[in-house]
Regions:
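C-terminal terminal-subdomain/extension
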Residues: 101-157
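Soluble catalytic domains of membrane acyltransferases
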Residues: 1-109, 113-115, 121-124
Length: 157
């Protein structure tokens, strides 16, 4: 992610989407589905603090069943210089066709905006504060996921 581009977009009142879980979120095994991974180093929080932009938490339910990751060939992925090499119920058995996701129903939930007006731009340099705020966002989204999963009737509809 490029902080300068994010600053420029926010200065023009554009919306941006950040995925603080990063690659760790897409390379987690199926048994770990809907358990959020650590949220990186807090660059998105620093951005919100510097620009005073609100953060709208978003939880997506359904995507983790679309391509269930059963195993990762980490050593081979490292040799190929790719983030991960998946083994799913259909890949590599079906070749490239096995990379096509299953048709699951996705539910996208948006939470209440989290404001950072109580902090000045200098708060972006406070690593402890950034860590606490990042964990607050992570637990908010995890709670949204947990609630959505409890209400879901099926993966398919």
């Amino acid at each position: 992610a490029c902080q300068e581009n994010a600053d420029r977009l926010l200065a023009k009142d554009n919306l941006i989407r950040v995925v603080p879980e990063g690659v760790q979120g897409i390379r987690k095994l199926f048994r770990d589905r809907y358990r959020l991974q650590r949220f990186g180093r807090g660059g998105y929080i620093r951005l919100c603090l510097r620009t005073r932009a609100p953060l709208i938490p978003c939880a997506i339910i359904g995507g983790e069943e679309a391509s269930p990751l059963l195993y990762r060939f980490d050593a081979l992925a490292d040799l190929l210089r790719i983030p991960y090499l998946p083994v799913t119920p259909t890949f590599p058995a079906l070749g490239a066709l096995g990379l096509v996701p299953a048709p699951t129903k996705w539910r996208i939930k948006f939470g209440e905006p989290i404001q950072f007006d109580n902090y000045g731009p200098e708060a972006a340099d406070d690593d402890l504060l950034v860590g606490r705020l990042s964990e607050r966002v992570r637990t908010t989204i995890q709670s949204m996921l947990d609630n959505g999963l409890q209400k879901r009737r099926s993966v398919w509809f």
